[in-house]
Amino acid sequence: MLSANMLRRMHHGVAVTRMLLVSNGKVQVKKSALYPVMAKLARTYATKNYPAHTVINMPALSPTMTTGNIGAFQKKIGDKIEPGDVLCEIETDKAQIDFEQQDEGYLAKILIETGTKDVPVGKPLAVTVENEGDVAAMADFTIEDSSAKEPSAKSGEEKSAPSSEKQSKETSSPSNVSGEERGDRVFASPLARKLAEEKDLDLSQIRGSGPNGRIIKVDIENFKPVVAPKPSNEAAAKATTPAASAADAAAPGDYEDLPLSNMRKIIASRLAESKNMNPHYYVTVSVNMEKIIRLRAALNAMADGRYKLSVNDLVIKATTAALRQVPEVNAAWMGDFIRQYKNVDISMAVATPSGLITPVIRNTHALGLAEISTLAKDYGQRARNNKLKPEEYQGGTFTISNLGMFPVDQFTAIINPPQACILAVGTTVDTVVPDSTSEKGFKVAPIMKCTLSSDHRVVDGAMAARFTTALKKILENPLEIML
């Protein structure tokens, strides 16, 4: 009786697959679940006597990703694949990402064509073989021949109901993933493991944002154990009825239905949840920008081409200084406790053709203006080109949304959960203000309005007032930024 155990080694987050060959030629395959960022690879000998091959599945490239759109394949059938080669482009809910491979081989079959939308995480995308001579033998291979089980929309209903405690953990956050989906082995930094142990958290329920899906400190800090209850079917039906009626009443040719991108779907879901669940309130302050504008001009004049500061760069730096003075605002709602951050990581709202994304400038309290300016320009450009890496837009402790480039005097923004606050920055408007030093008793000054949206569960009105007062003082006396 022929039997052998084959064990693929764990390599940078690639899932482990065990195979057992038995005498009748059949194969039993036991797969561990997809580890974040990397694809699930399943080595198998299928029942149709295909040669040894590897099935490459749709990876989870961000904590909130459940489906992805397939862009252009960078390899053709028969091409050799080296570690680090890009197989194809995948549009996630946040960006367009190059899907790199970790093992060498030859591309033998493409199962999902370029342009396919809403491909579920875990669905087979392609097949590779180790030997070039085996490529032709895979020509008739189909998804049904794959050992990887296709995800089903009803899979959650078909499984036995978990205990209420486990179910709560599994559905508590977009960054959660069940142990069954994740596999037995979890990659985490020593500090992350220590923090998880202190907080009594199950690492298998946390999706990592570090290199190749590794769980790092920020993942532990951002893990949310509580989620909003889903609306009842009756409530959902009532909510959708007016929209359906309006659509039915519209005359043909009066409108165009635009498909939703993955990013737009996630924006709709997260912001609706934030607005419905987080008790928002707003505090607005008017800032005289005379001195900050003069400081910007002076610094740019002496830059000698090394940098070019924008008003937004100075706003980021001033906001950072204000957060250090009022740290209660640099916080997050974590369900049964409030997390107050010691570091300042500014999420910067950037408009892209696909929707809004918030790249994170980390540790702005330790960066100079030139460094902030360089990072802001780089992240902004790559965000608009869908070239951000997942770790560059995940996390953040405080968000700034600046519409100062438009003629928008003032606006309010929706909080980016789990953060407690977001600052909405308007344009600078020449405004008549009192001036005791002028014979006329007034002057015209460039005034900018900033509105802080706060989660009242975390930040009380007095805290918001102290923060906006500190921000106003720093912007109107910008030498404080240098301290």
Curated annotation (Swiss-Prot):
Active site per database record: H456, D460
EC number, UniProt record: 2.3.1.12
Record's protein name: Dihydrolipoyllysine-residue acetyltransferase component of pyruvate dehydrogenase complex, mitochondrial
Cellular localization per UniProt: Mitochondrion matrix
Every Lipoyl-binding domain range: 53-129
Annotated segments matching region Disordered: 143-187, 234-254
Annotated signal sequence range: none
Enzyme class: transferase
